[in-house]
UniProtKB/Swiss-Prot annotation:
May form heteromers. This is Glutamate receptor 1.2. Residues 28-560, 644-792 are extracellular. The chain crosses the membrane at residues 561-581, 591-611, 623-643, 793-813. PANTHER family: IONOTROPIC GLUTAMATE RECEPTOR. Residues 582-590, 612-622, 814-867 are cytoplasmic.
Amino acid sequence: MVRICIQTPILLSFLLVLLFFISNCFASSQNNDDDKRIRVRVGLVLDLGSVEGKIVRSSVSMALSDFYDNHNDYKTRLSLLVRDSHGEPLLALDSVVDLLQTEGVQAIIGGNSLLEAKLLAELGEKARVPVISLNSPMSLSLSKYTHLIQATHNSASEVKGITAFLHGFDWNSVALVLEDHDDWRESMHFMVDHFHENNVHVQSKVAFSVTSSEDSLMDRLRELKDLGTTVFVVHLSEVIATRLFPCAEKLGMMGEGFAWILTSRSMSSFHDQFIDDLTKEAMEGVVGFKSYIPMSKELHNFTLRWRKTLPVEEVTGSEITRLSISGVWAHDVAWSLASAAEVTRMPTVTSTLLEAIKESRFKGLSGNFQLDDMKLLSDKFEIVNMIGSGERRVGFWNSNGSFSNRRQLSSTHDNLETIIWPGGSAQSPKGRSLRESGRKKLRVLVTSSNRFPRLMKVETDPITHEITIVEGFCIEVFQASIAPFNYEVEYIRWLNGTNYTKLAYALHSQKDKYDAAVGDITITSDRSMYVDFTLPYTEMGLGIVAAKERSMWVFFQPLTPNLWITSAAFFVLTGIIVWLIERAENKEFQGSWPQQIGVVIWFGFSTLVYAHREKLQHNLSRFVVTVWVFAVLILVTSYTATLTSMMTVQQIRFNANEDYVGHLSGSLIANAALTNSSLRAMRLLGLNTSEDYAQALMNKSVSYIVSELPYLKILLGENPGHFLMVKTQSTTNGFGFMFQKGSELAPNVSREIAKLRTSERLNEMERRWFDKQLPYTTDDTSNPITLYRFRGLFMITGVSFAFALAVLLILWLRERWEILVNSVNIYFSQRLRHFRILFTRTIHPSPLGLDNPIGENAVQMAQRNRR
């Protein structure tokens, strides 16, 4: 017994030493394995002071831990380098620059806002490093970045779901409530366009910022209520939403008959710690769209383990209560990065980290992970109903464009469970349906000066003073633009003259009386302070019109003097060259010198009309004439076209009264333009109608008329052929319709005007009311043809003439070659003999008298005579 007791401590000591040795060996081997592993550095830039930042950080860390527990044999390890951006895009940018330069990170996770995503994407493009953005809004401005990966909501699918939801309840008129920030405005543009394409009328659109006061919220909501709006689509963050809904409840807008729909981006920004009991109570009955992540065993287990890893103070303080969709995306993104890092380290793989991420395929917590056009999109949405302090799921919006619910319980909406609306009613609000509530009356002020009836004509009953006729180009455009919105229009005559700035102020100050104004109203900056203008529906700018002046010498103007002289010289040169070629054999080119000169000139100029009667016998002369006739054809054709243009629109010449300029009486626009240095005049003459314009120009009371283009088009249309638009300047903004400040009709009508313009209907209206084609201007007149423009033509002709002369010279030399050779030989032999004699006498001088060959010959002759 004693022996056993003695041996037991020894045995235990031995076992402890053995275990210690084994553990050290295992640890050392593990450390050796860790040293052999390749570290891939990844930057994680988040707002660590926000709930989303904390969720994403913890989710990424836990995801990497799980990944390498499951893949312990991998040779790579992601090393997270976390930086706090404090919610500031510039701090995030600075952090990423530091990570790239000092740490050499190979990927970046960050960029939750639109601006932050753009900044980080720019760096990613230059450094060729993938940037993964979580929950940043979809935007066309981000599509150009090839190294940016987005995990976000599918905005297109969501907008289709909201539109189908509205149509299901027969709501075709809504108000949009959004946050005045780039992130929220950007994603709202697609929604507005989709609503318009699907006949959902956006009655009003209001924007709030985080700095908006409660009074501002109340005032804007009260305006919406006064408009009769009952259906609202809300797209803003929880910071504003928690203040908006209590204000709406105070105004009675969270009761029966109202409907509020929250977008998925708004719903994903809600966290329990920001929503107090008052806000939860006010939001009862609100319907929201949320990106749907199907619950799975893996997601459930991960969420439970994730909550256990959170600090105690965050769990007990209810700061973080659930894993957000950004946290789920962060988990899957971390797995794809870890998998891609391992793939790129394989010796047989040449893919970059970005390419490996794009090719990643696995089943993650959010479902099947697969990038589509550099995006990980959530295109299925669950529809929740805010009840009490929580949410109740009432159905799903599927990517195939249909609604469904798990219980298959029917409600007032197909395939959705029963919704409890604001006020506690299960009966769906009727909304502001124009088909049910009838046509809304639109009270429109119309200008009634009747100075240009083709633009605007208003007639009233002399007894009742009620408007009996409203017509004109402006009215037709307005009626075509407002027709899609099914308004009953009530026209009200404006009786205070042509001061349309006062008209704008009246529309602004008397909102209870007027909704819009129509007429020949120019868009100006001072008027836009009071009202909202539509797009211009007329041409923009001023024009100058003057009377045409006929010229008796217009036929000289198509060609410049240099071209006239050069053409005449080539006509004569053609005759000379043909005469040189034909005169030896052709009798028609022979005769006395006066006759031959006449033939040369006649033949050259007769080619102008192809009327030369002389028959050519030499092919060389035919070649010369063919080339020149081609040149003449081009000259004549160009001359005819230019002369036609000049006779259609002749240059004008102002009359002697250069100090008189006509303009529309009372037009502030024309008066302001005439003070410009380019249109300055000594004296102005105010005119009232198009008839006054025409009479003043015809009797030369004014030199020209300066007015806006629509007025001048009417003048030219009523007096075709008498006047000419000399010049135009884009110094005005054209005519537009005026609406109340903030009215949604202004952008909607602008969109209809754009459609009228692109469909050519607007041009048809102009032709019908102005009764003419587009006016000719001096800009339409062709410039005279210069010699420089035809230098190539004359170069070709000159080279052809030179070639013909060269051939003629060669033929002449060949015919007279023997005679020329003999003459040359005789000439050179005589010169050689004289040279030899001169050379001989220079070397051996002769006796006196003998050095003169003439003297020598004389002596010899004398001797012969003696014999």
